[in-house]
Amino acid sequence: ENEDPFYYDYETVRNGGLIFAALAFIVGLVIILSKRFRCGAKKKHRQIPEDGL
């Protein structure tokens, strides 16, 4: 029935694209949040030595 080489099952293509987009979004959030928490945990207040003023 589907002898045309340019026939696409658009429902499958759409579902695959939505899954890919959702995974890319989640991975991006994880990367952003991990960088934010890592940088926030390591950030220390720099103490200025009193004799240096």
UniProtKB/Swiss-Prot annotation:
It is found in: Membrane. Signal peptide: none annotated. Keywords: Ion transport, Membrane, Potassium, Potassium transport, Sodium, Sodium transport, Sodium/potassium transport, Transmembrane, Transmembrane helix, Transport. GO terms for biological process: potassium ion transport; regulation of monoatomic ion transport; sodium ion transport. It is a single-pass type III membrane protein. GO terms for cellular component: membrane. The keyword NADP does not apply. Highest levels expressed in the kidney and spleen. Restricted to the basolateral membrane in renal epithelial cells and varies in its level of expression along the nephron. The N-terminus is blocked. It comes from the Eukaryota. PROSITE patterns: FXYD. This is Sodium/potassium-transporting ATPase subunit gamma.
